[in-house]
Amino acid sequence: ASDVYKRQDVIIGQGTSCKELIEEYGFFDHIIVPIGGGGLIAGTALAVKYFGDNCSVIGTEPLEVDDAYRSLISGKIESNSTTNTIADGLKTQLGDKNFPIILKEVKSIIRITEDEIIESMKLIWQHLKIICEPSCSLPLAGVIKNREQFLGKKIGIIITGGNVDLKNLPF
């Protein structure tokens, strides 16, 4: 079940989170999501294509585990040489079914440092009162890191997952 993100039905199902976001809040300039195996961002990209009205999809992933970033540049699936990140939900390899969607529909990918991951997770916990896992804090970190790019824009971020192992937190 660890490669479930590669299944087309799962990719489409994950896109419903974006569809619901658009239905609830209207159109966005950008929707930002974390990238691990690529199912969520591929599903989001498909939803934006059909429901998003000129919205761009931007991915976020850990700097140390940046296979999607490198794959988007090279045009082929790249591997990681390390899985050294607190964002353990994003250590998975991109799937072959979702990569063509990512390549065609994703505008860019922002790489996030470990410190940025931790700081954005703390902000979500403290200010939104949402217990999210480190992997899910990357979209907020991407907005903070590139605040000038997003200034005056309507941004949607998808925060998923609350699987937190308190023993592994660095604070």
Language model regions located:
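Glycine-rich phosphate/pyrophosphate-binding loop at beta-loop-alpha junctions
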Residues: 6-104, 150-151, 155-171
